[in-house]
């Protein structure tokens, strides 16, 4: 696996910087970095931890990664930082308002999880990689210390699911009931809340779960939820992680807003 810890404001563009005069050729090598990341994609797990800013070139790294945790108030990513945005568009905006942790966790969906500090970020990366093989030709690791029996019967499921199909319920409660020890790694939980994508285990075996969430837009599919589910399924497919679908969906969203967003392509 490849893990980046990103804390970079990008290349210097002042007269002494890498992009000045004859020095611009020195920065051209960054294209090779992006090429290698593309080649590695789907072959080994790619993690980009945003522990600081990632502007310009360093913003492409998380854009190509599989898993992007961000440290709250520290991490950010944008193709152009606030000074460049001001120079080009005239807009005054802070680093966090432009591409901070809340923005990418809730609005854009580029970030997967917003965490409190770097220690929590590292622990989360370890948890993510515990589900992953070392590379695509290796089987996902199986935990042998699981004591949660796979054949257990849980009557609480009958209480979670309502009798009426028009009544919302907690899909997370169902997911946690059927997996080992109730532990899940929820990916992009604050973006496209109408669908849940998470990693978990059953009998020690890693699985990916895709579940419609009745508490988010009634579980209906829209552009963002389709993108979220598709990206997650591609990662699971690349690394041999079985998928479990919990389906309760009224269909695709309709209306001018989603048509203008290109829902037919999704």
Q: How would you describe each model-predicted region?
A:
Residues 24-27, 69-71, 161-169, 198-202:
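Short low-complexity stretches enriched in small and charged residues
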Residues 6-137, 241, 249-266:
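Conserved catalytic cores of soluble enzyme domains
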Residues 8-9, 141-153, 192-193, 246-253:
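A glycine-rich phosphate-binding loop feature that marks nucleotide/adenosyl-phosphate handling sites
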Residues 86-93, 109-116, 160-169, 214-221:
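Short, exposed beta-strand "edge-strand" segments with a Pro/Gly-rich flavor and a Y/T-containing core
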């Amino acid at each position: 696996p490849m893990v980046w810890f990103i804390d970079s404001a990008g290349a210097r563009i002042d007269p002494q910087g890498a992009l000045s005069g004859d020095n611009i050729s020195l920065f051209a090598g960054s294209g090779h970095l992006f090429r290698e990341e593309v080649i590695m994609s789907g072959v080994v797990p790619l993690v980009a931890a945003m522990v600081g800013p990632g502007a310009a070139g360093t913003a492409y790294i998380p854009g190509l990664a599989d898993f992007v945790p961000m440290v709250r108030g520290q991490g950010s990513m944008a193709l152009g930082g606030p000074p460049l945005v001001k120079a080009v568009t005239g807009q005054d905006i802070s680093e966090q308002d432009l591409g901070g942790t809340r923005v990418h966790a809730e609005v854009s969906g580029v970030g997967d999880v917003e965490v409190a500090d770097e220690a929590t970020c590292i622990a989360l990366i370890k948890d993510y990689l515990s589900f992953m093989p070392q590379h695509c030709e290796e089987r996902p690791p199986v935990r042998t210390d699981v004591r949660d029996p796979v054949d257990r019967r849980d009557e609480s499921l009958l209480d979670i699911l309502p009798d009426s199909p028009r009544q919302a319920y907690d899909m997370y409660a169902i997911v946690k009931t059927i997996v080992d020890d109730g532990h899940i790694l929820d990916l992009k939980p604050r973006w496209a809340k109408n669908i849940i994508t998470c990693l978990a285990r059953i009998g020690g075996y890693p699985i990916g779960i895709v579940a419609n969430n009745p508490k988010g837009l009634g579980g209906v599919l829209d552009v963002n939820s389709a993108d979220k589910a598709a990206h997650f399924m591609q990662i699971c497919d690349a690394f041999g992680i079985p998928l479990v679908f919990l389906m309760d969906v009224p269909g695709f969203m309709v209306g001018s807003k989603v048509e203008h967003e290109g829902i037919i392509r999704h």
